[in-house]
Swiss-Prot record:
It comes from Arabidopsis thaliana (Mouse-ear cress). The keyword Endoplasmic reticulum applies. It is an enzyme of class 2 (transferase). This is Glutaminyl-peptide cyclotransferase. Glycans are attached at N99, N163.
């Protein structure tokens, strides 16, 4: 820290002492007050600069419980390629495992499953059905084990990556089981609320959790999850939106708007489709894949900057 200059202290003292002797006490007080006020201005500016410098970046521009202005981080999409997808698959979890191989979990009572799928053909190579009492939900891969959660229960299951045989069930501590993802160490989970959970994969105990908000409003119905470039991406149920979330503190980092996909399917006559759900990431080739429940297609997409009107769309369509 810089030391104060004795020259500046002496100059200020000299200016005060140089007041005429005939000046009244009130004049001297007014002069001193003006000088004190003048000195307070640069001090206040300096204090403000120091405060801003040490503030966490993700709290700039936001009040308690609100989010940053994300207008520069709202993306729409372009379709790079289309692939066949089982139109009877009620997709709940999706992941890419290399060599053009996908793993997918499906839902609905009596139809829930975990499956290994060929990306190019959409062919189901291995299928493991769940007990009819379970409604399959999110899926992720950690090491050689697939982890899956189920709807309306705290029970989940692990599967052997090679043949999809069940290894053992587990109990988690989320309110419900919706989505799962991993960074290779921890598991991230969603339960249909606005909460993003971090869990220990050995014990399934919750080690951290955060409420996700946008402009002060909770982003509810976080569904299928994927870990992409140090972010957790979440489908928002009943919408064509993906929320980009910081796994460190739950702050909202951006939005991806994908309504053109469902519109295109409906326009081409696929009236039986359900909502967008399913994100898969090929980290080696930087390829991004998405699909939906009962969708006949799976898409490879890339992001592009959204139009200026997208902010209104988020308020109306993403915050369901």
């Amino acid at each position: 820290m810089a030391t104060r200059s004795p020259y500046k202290r002496q100059t200020k003292r000299s200016m005060i002492q140089s007041l005429p002797a005939s000046s009244s006490a009130s004049s001297r007080r007014r002069f001193i007050s003006r000088k004190r006020f003048a000195m307070m201005i640069p001090l206040a500016l300096l204090s403000g600069a120091v405060f801003l410098f040490f503030m966490p970046f993700n709290s700039w521009g936001q009040s308690s419980g609100s989010s940053l202005d994300l207008s520069h981080r709202i993306n729409e999409i372009e379709v790079v390629a289309e692939f066949p997808h089982d139109p009877d698959a009620f997709t709940q979890g999706l992941l890419y495992a290399g060599n053009d191989t996908l793993f997918e979990s499906t839902g609905l009572y009596g139809k829930s499953s975990v499956r290994k799928v060929d990306l190019r053909t959409g062919k189901v190579e291995i299928l493991e059905k769940m007990d009819n009492t379970y409604f399959g939900e999110g899926l992720t891969l950690l090491g050689e084990r697939l982890f899956q959660v189920a709807w309306l229960t705290n029970t989940g299951f692990t599967y052997d990556l090679r043949n999809l045989s069940k290894v053992k069930p587990f109990k988690h501590h989320m309110k419900d089981g919706w989505g799962l993802a991993t960074d290779g160490k921890a598991l991230f989970g969603s339960d249909g609320t606005s909460t993003l959970y971090r869990m220990d994969p050995q014990t399934m105990k919750v080690t951290d959790k955060h409420i996700v908000r946008y402009n002060g409003r909770e982003v509810r119905y976080l569904n299928e999850l994927e870990y992409i470039n140090n972010e957790v991406w979440a489908n928002v149920w009943q919408s064509d939106c993906i929320a980009r979330i910081s796994p460190k503190d739950g702050s909202l980092l951006g939005w991806i708007l994908l309504s053109k996909l469902s519109r295109g399917l409906l326009k081409s006559g696929h009236r039986g489709i359900d909502v967008l759900n399913g994100i898969a990431w090929d980290s080696d080739k930087q390829r991004l894949f998405v699909t939906g429940k009962l969708w006949p297609k799976l898409y490879q997409i890339k992001l592009k900057q959204a139009s200026a009107k997208s902010g209104n769309y988020i308020e109306q369509q993403c915050l369901v």
